[in-house]
From Swiss-Prot:
Keywords: Lipid transport, Lipid-binding, Mitochondrion, Phosphoprotein, Steroidogenesis, Transit peptide, Transport. Plays a key role in steroid hormone synthesis by enhancing the metabolism of cholesterol into pregnenolone. Mediates the transfer of cholesterol from the outer mitochondrial membrane to the inner mitochondrial membrane where it is cleaved to pregnenolone. The modification Phosphoserine is found at S57, S195. It comes from Ovis aries (Sheep). GO terms for biological process: cholesterol metabolic process; intracellular cholesterol transport; regulation of steroid biosynthetic process; steroid biosynthetic process. This is Steroidogenic acute regulatory protein, mitochondrial. It holds the Pfam family START. It is found in: Mitochondrion. May interact with TSPO. Disulfide bonds: none annotated. Residues 1-63 form a transit peptide. Pathway: Steroid metabolism; cholesterol metabolism. Residues 67-280 form the START domain.
Length: 285
């Protein structure tokens, strides 16, 4: 009965099976062979179970990929590669130079990275749980202009799956208007690794958001924020922000360094005020 049912199903879906490629055909063939073998009363080998599970996992991955266009898959890959690059920079503890240290312990470090340029690293502790920061920085991202004076506006242009988005950010003038208005188009990727949340991004091209008149299109390099519960105090959060920006235009390096370093210090202060004054939503990282 089982064998007959399989043959009937296989016959009715023959045209569909013909359109399958690679692993899909192999999976169908393996299932057919196993059903035939079971009809003869043989035992189920562990090796076959392993192969079906493996093929099923690969097939699931292929089916998930098929939900996205080639361009969307390219954005996903670009975001994940930016995350790996940024985490690799943070992992290397050698060569960091102290830019500033605040009374509350907030610290900005810098380092020159080959093929990237000068990057800045903010290290702070926030007296809020990690979920609250995740909520504000990810789920309420488009509201950042309400509390961060460095940002005029952030818009999510496209969501791709559950981890990847394309954003447009309009930055405010800085350094007494010496640094004019800039905007950024970025691909951002959000992942959780155990108790750690990583929010990463980098500059990208997006046809629906061409360069704006009167605004310089700047670029984020591999950038990320890492959130994790403070060791021994899970209601507090250790935030590490790696900032890499090419502001474009002609600007003295001394001004660029001062602006980026101060931007990180100001961000930490404004974030704390926002978290204290704005009620939390039900968010989980």
């Amino acid at each position: 009965m089982l064998l007959a049912t399989f043959k009937l199903c296989a016959g009715s879906s023959y045209r569909h099976v013909r359109s399958m490629k690679g692993l899909r055909q192999q999976a169908v063939l393996a299932i057919g062979q196993e059903l035939n073998r079971r009809a003869l009363g043989g035992p189920a080998p562990a090796a076959w179970i392993y192969q079906v599970r493996r093929r099923g996992s690969l097939l699931g991955s292929q089916l998930e990929d098929s939900l996205y266009s080639d361009q969307e898959l390219a954005y996903i890959q670009q975001g994940e590669e930016a995350m790996q690059r940024a985490l690799g920079i943070l992992k290397d503890q050698e060569g960091w130079k102290k830019e500033s240290r605040q009374v509350n312990g907030d610290e900005v470090l810098s380092k020159v990275i080959p093929d990237v340029g000068k990057v800045f690293r903010l290290e702070v502790v926030v007296d809020q749980p990690m979920e609250r920061l995740y909520e504000e920085l990810v789920e309420r991202m488009e509201a950042m202009g309400e509390w961060n004076p460095s940002v005029k506006e952030i818009k999510v242009l496209q969501k791709i799956g559950k981890d990847t988005i394309i954003t447009h950010e309009l930055a405010a003038e800085a350094a007494g208007n010496l640094v004019g208005p800039r905007d950024f188009v970025s691909v951002r990727c959000t992942k959780r690794r155990g108790s750690m949340c990583v929010l990463a991004g980098t500059a990208t091209l997006y046809e629906e958001m061409p360069q704006q008149k009167g605004v310089i299109r700047a670029e984020h390099g591999p950038t990320c924020m890492v959130l994790r519960p403070l060791a021994g105090s899970p209601s507090r959060t250790k935030l590490t922000w790696l900032l890499s920006i090419d502001l474009k235009g002609w600007l003295p390096k001394t001004i660029i360094n001062q602006v980026l370093s101060q931007t990180q210090v100001d961000f930490a202060n404004h974030l704390r005020k926002r978290l204290e004054s704005c009620p939390a939503l039900e968010a989980r990282c």
